[in-house]
Amino acid sequence: MKMTSIQQRAELHRQIWQIANDVRGSVDGWDFKQYVLGALFYRFISENFSSYIEAGDDSICYAKLDDSVITDDIKDDAIKTKGYFIYPSQLFCNVAAKANTNDRLNADLNSIFVAIESSAYGYPSEADIKGLFADFDTTSNRLGNTVKDKNARLAAVLKGVEGLKLGDFNEHQIDLFGDAYEFLISNYAANAGKSGGEFFTPQHVSKLIAQLAMHGQTHVNKIYDPAAGSGSLLLQAKKQFDNHIIEEGFFGQEINHTTYNLARMNMFLHNINYDKFDIKLGNTLTEPHFRDEKPFDAIVSNPPYSVKWIGSDDPTLINDERFAPAGVLAPKSKADFAFVLHALNYLSAKGRAAIVCFPGIFYRGGAEQKIRQYLVDNNYVETVISLAPNLFFGTTIAVNILVLSKHKTDTNVQFIDASELFKKETNNNILTDAHIEQIMQVFASKEDVAHLAKSVAFETVVANDYNLSVSSYVEAKDNREIIDIAELNAELKTTVSKIDQLRKDIDAIVAEIEGCEVQK
């Protein structure tokens, strides 16, 4: 019996995680992740490149060709199209085939990765390819203390990834690579606790955020994430909508070097060509990229919660075009609103931004209240959604989603209380498709629904000191049992009379027993 795609996927996931655990030995999974993820990426680009060269011609097997038959023209054309070049001898399948007997495996892998990256030098793809394998350190002691140990561990990784049933490239199973990669990242994040949440947004939450940002748009120029992590949020937009809807591609910035490389690999693994994505490394708040590429029609983000930033210690920031309109900077101890104002500045007139936020920023005073006033007075706040707790890796906090828009048709602010919409699954809660659909329905209609959603007039928000806390406007359902006092008194009366009767019965029995004893 043929397995269904769901069964195939479940089996693949089981196999991947088993391999990931088998090959790491005593090394912590979190520290070893770049080797498994890197090997998966290496296999992907090798098969992707071979498929491009063969172009559907069954008479050609690129992996069996000799490197010497490759002309400069073939190489030049390939790099212009794919962004990189891999010689037949450098392909994953050829390296993996000899891995167990290659006593120079770690050196050979390093040379191959350097060659792949350097093949893009001087081409438009150079920045997208450069440093992709930087975290795949073939000399690291995490692999073992001796060269022999290192090679054995590397061979185990390659052989493990080689054995994954990821389908033929020509069988439209390309998404299996991306799916396998996302599954691995998700599992590493779940097992890493707090640090895992910093680079991966769970797919169910990503789905909601992508739908909020893209709602009602038949096409967007490009989509942007100012705190991109591993790219999972950006890619969710690709999964939710046809490719042609996002015309110019995917843009993001990430501060952590390892995570930045994961994000770029993730783009390739989801078959996004180098000219359709641009992920930059750096601090979004103090060294923002893409000033020339803005505005963006869709912005999605799950920035770090309440991190410290330089804020008022940098006198130039209050005059920065992103922060100046609000007249105040986000507190140095809580950068949340700095990310919000950055996103707003990068948003187009027809666009939407959906940003995951720490709930405190919606009710605290001081600078944060002034920023809320700026956002509300200028009618940028479309919706605030409170989510259930424990939806994210590394935190049990019940976070909010802030939806910003520059094309609202009224001055109301919508509040949605989705804190009861969740399903318990292992250690975390999840949003089901039905939950997401329910949230999107009320978001789209803007109708008031008891205990779920309320559209609040601008004047009411102002009168409430610009408090944007969902609980201030959506009345929570009272789950306490309603007690009927009259009914309770009647039951009490009946119970008391029963007790009185029982006492009389007991007294009679006692008297009878005592009478019998006297007669004796």
Curated annotation (Swiss-Prot):
Assembly information from the UniProt record: The type I restriction/modification system is composed of three polypeptides R, M and S; the restriction enzyme has stoichiometry R(2)M(2)S(1) while the methyltransferase is M(2)S(1). There is an equilibrium between R(2)M(2)S(1) and R(1)M(2)S(1); the latter is methylation and translocation proficient but restriction deficient. (Microbial infection) Holoenenzyme interacts with Escherichia phage T7 protein Ocr; this interaction leads to the inhibition of the restriction activity, but may still allow methylation and translocation.
GO BP annotation list: DNA restriction-modification system; methylation
Biological source species: Escherichia coli
Catalytic activity: a 2'-deoxyadenosine in DNA + S-adenosyl-L-methionine = an N(6)-methyl-2'-deoxyadenosine in DNA + S-adenosyl-L-homocysteine + H(+)
Region annotation (Catalytic domain) ranges: 198-473
E.C. number: 2.1.1.72
GO molecular function: DNA binding; N-methyltransferase activity; site-specific DNA-methyltransferase (adenine-specific) activity
UniProtKB keywords: DNA-binding, Methyltransferase, Plasmid, Restriction system, S-adenosyl-L-methionine, Transferase
Stored SUPFAM superfamilies: S-adenosyl-L-methionine-dependent methyltransferases
This protein's domain notes: The C-terminus is required for assembly of the restriction enzyme complex. The individual domains assume different positions in the enzyme, allowing the holoenzyme to regulate the methylase, endonuclease and translocation states.
InterPro entries hit by this protein: D12N6_MeTrfase_N, DNA_Adenine_Mtase, DNA_methylase_A-5, DNA_methylase_N6_adenine_CS, Restrct_endonuc_T1M, SAM-dependent_MTases_sf, T1MK-like_N_sf
Primary gene name: hsdM
Function field: The subtype gamma methyltransferase (M) subunit of a type I restriction enzyme. In the presence of the R subunit the complex can also act as an endonuclease, binding to the same target sequence but cutting the DNA some distance from this site. Whether the DNA is cut or modified depends on the methylation state of the target sequence. When the target site is unmodified, the DNA is cut.
Binding site residues for S-adenosyl-L-methionine: E198, F199, F200, T201, P202, Q203, S230, G231, S232, E254
Record-given protein name: Type I restriction enzyme EcoR124I/EcoR124II methylase subunit
Family label: Belongs to the N(4)/N(6)-methyltransferase family.
Broad enzyme group: transferase
